[in-house]
Amino acid sequence: MADFEGLFPAIITPMSRDTGKLNEAAFREVMEFNIQAGVHGFWVAGGTGESVLLDDDENMRIAEIAADQSRGRIKNIMHVGAATTERAIALAENAARAGVEAICCVPPFFYRQTDEAIVEHYRAVAAAADLPLFVYNLPQSTGVEITPELMQKIQDAVPQLKGLKHSAPSFPNVREFAHMGLDCFIGSSLLMLPALTIGAIGCVDGPPNFAPELWLEIWDAYNAGDIKRAEVAQDRASEATMLVREFGLHATAKVILSERLGIDCGDPRAPGRPLSKEKQAIVLRRAEELGLTRVAVAQGDD
């Protein structure tokens, strides 16, 4: 297996229902559940992890926990994106100290920047960590699309650049990024199989958090050359993604994981809203219909 490929769930950040702060024990449980299911790595403190709602201490602690809990069994790609270069550098330096395998970063957002400013931002952040860098292409949230043309400028200036998570609607660009020699994760779990066929090296998204087995089946079938089985697996996995689209990612993922693992992952951080009791019941019934039932997570290996 290459350094980075396969299924990398964008992991949630469980919150304490009492304090609203990071629930470290639940975070470790969610990691361990996914590791034992067979995932290849994690995308940590990204959009699914409510990154822009975390303070610096929480972000830094999450990096430490991720590295400690994985203990080299999988690879962690830690999100260090921020609106300012100074803050992103500080988060990148901490990620490197924590011992994660790579960093990822959205472009600077809110204020529109020139291509030159974006390139310099990535150069400075990557140099601070000196780890493999994955660009986080999420224009729906950042207002900035990393086009192949802009990516070429970043590639020319940033020696640490490894690849990207491509969550933009421009699906054909996956092929262009692959032709550039970049490791391109598709950022939509609905498109894992078609993306693999045009050069993606895996999938990073939120729904695999609570149902890693569904997307691992796609990965295994595709790599075995069994496209029909992969198509069936993609259809089944997509039902879980559509559940998230109907009820909201953060609340839905936390409800299902809480039920499957027998823990409390809390609610989305405000202004995010929890699901009503009625909606929780619908989500859990639909999850059970997909076979997403209670699992036992063994103690992680020392």
Which positions does each model-derived feature cover?
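Active-site beta->alpha loop and helix N-cap motifs at the rims of alpha/beta catalytic domains
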Residues: 2-143, 153, 297
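C-terminal alpha-helical cap/extension of soluble enzyme domains
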Residues: 3-14, 37-39, 197-200, 204, ...
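Short, charged helix-to-loop "capping" segments that act as catalytic/coupling loops
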Residues: 15-24, 156-161, 258-264
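A general structural signal for well-ordered alpha-helical segments in protein cores
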Residues: 27, 59, 63, 88, ...
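Residue-level "edge-of-site" marker
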Residues: 47, 82, 108, 139, ...
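Short helix-capping segments at alpha-helix termini
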Residues: 68-74, 98-99, 129-131, 156-160, ...
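Catalytic alpha/beta core domains of metabolic enzymes, predominantly
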Residues: 126-128, 139-247
